Structure formats: structure tokens, C-alpha cells
Design a protein with these regions (language model features):
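Peripheral, non-catalytic segments flanking oxidoreductase cores
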Residues: 1-194
């Protein structure tokens, strides 16, 4: 278990800014419009998940957030493409899906380079993880934490949790809130720098 900050990654400022613009535009749509993008039967693997719907493992109260999932854009494996749900197209925002796909692919490529560095550190072949992650079941989750107008009872923005993925890449947050539990059992702020 670990947490690091990375500089010189593949996600450029222009793409990051475009993603924030598109995602903000989506979350500013009415609840009625956003509800058209809730995909039943997929356990929130693609599309929109509304405010308060998801809760952390062991919690009964929904987190105070809403989010959108972009998933894998399968390349060169038609059988696998049939197994993954399609990404959801947002009709109201003409650039939303293209920007989401570009960001997804840049983050996935960044993750590949990080795993190659880990493989080298572990004295494995540099490309050891490549075959395990190619067309993997990755998710790009864009999260919106709406303003809280009154203090909620027992609810949290996002309850303490551990990620279940091989690695998790987080873009620098626009606000404070993310904390990481260190080996001494203390919660410390994870503050992202500009790059």
C-alpha cells in the first residue's frame, strides 16, 4: 500500500482543463437530464450515478457525491469488446465523450508507465504487467461533490475506504479533502501540486 505524487505524467493541462469543463457542464445539467444516463443493470460501471447512491463498504448511508464513469475503449479484441458495456454517449454535450476518451487513454498510458517502473523496481521484466493491463477493465471516474447546504446526519463526502484496483491514478483535486492513512494510523492531507 502506498501513495505517491507524480510529475511529468502524460495528462497535459489542456486536456485536463477540457475534461474539467466538460464534466462540470455535465453535472450542471438538470437532474432530469442526468437521470437519462443512469444505466440499469450495470452496477454503475458506465454512465451516471446520482447523488447519495454509492456508499463505502460497510456503510449504510450514501456518500455525498455524484459521478460519471468512462470505461475501456477495447482495441483489437472483438470478443472482449462484447463483454464490456459500451460507454454512454451524452447527447447534450458534443465534446464530452471525445474529451473523456482522450483523457481515459492518456491516464491508461500513464498507468502503464508507472507499472513498468514498478516492474523494474521489483527486478521483473519491464513489460511484465503489460499483458495484464492491455484492454483491462479500468474506469475513469469523474466525481462531483455538490455544495452541502445543511449538515447531513451521519453522511460523508466519501467515507474512508481502500481502493480495489491494481493502481489508482488521481488527478490533482480542485479542493481540499483527500486524506491518506499513513503507517502510523494517522490521516494526512494529500495535497496535489500544480503538475
Amino acid at each position: 500500500i502506498g501513495f505517491i505524487a507524480i510529475k511529468g505524467h502524460l495528462l497535459d493541462d489542456k486536456t485536463k482543463d477540457e475534461l474539467y469543463t466538460e464534466v462540470k457542464s455535465f453535472f450542471n445539467l438538470s437532474d432530469e437530464v442526468k437521470s437519462n444516463y443512469i444505466i440499469k443493470g450495470l452496477a454503475s460501471q458506465r454512465g451516471f450515478t446520482p447523488f447519495g447512491k454509492e456508499s463505502a463498504k460497510g456503510k449504510n448511508i450514501g456518500d455525498l457525491k455524484e459521478f460519471w464513469h468512462f470505461g475501456q475503449y477495447v482495441k483489437d479484441e472483438p470478443k472482449l469488446k462484447e463483454e464490456y458495456p459500451d460507454n454512454v454517449i451524452v447527447n447534450e454535450l458534443k465534446n464530452f465523450n471525445a474529451v473523456g476518451q482522450k483523457t481515459y487513454e492518456l491516464l491508461e498510458e500513464t498507468g502503464k508507465h508507472i507499472l513498468r517502473a514498478i516492474a523494474c523496481y521489483l527486478n521483473l521484466e519491464e513489460t511484465y504487467f503489460d499483458k495484464h493491463i492491455f484492454n483491462g477493465n479500468s474506469i475513469l471516474r469523474a466525481i462531483h461533490y455538490p455544495p452541502i447546504t445543511e449538515e447531513p446526519k451521519n453522511a460523508e463526502r466519501a467515507a474512508a475506504h481502500g481502493d480495489i484496483n491494481l493502481i489508482t491514478l488521481l488527478m490533482g483535486a480542485q479542493g481540499k479533502g483527500l486524506q491518506v492513512l499513513n503507517n502510523s494510523g494517522e490521516w494526512i492531507d494529500a495535497v496535489a501540486e500544480e503538475d
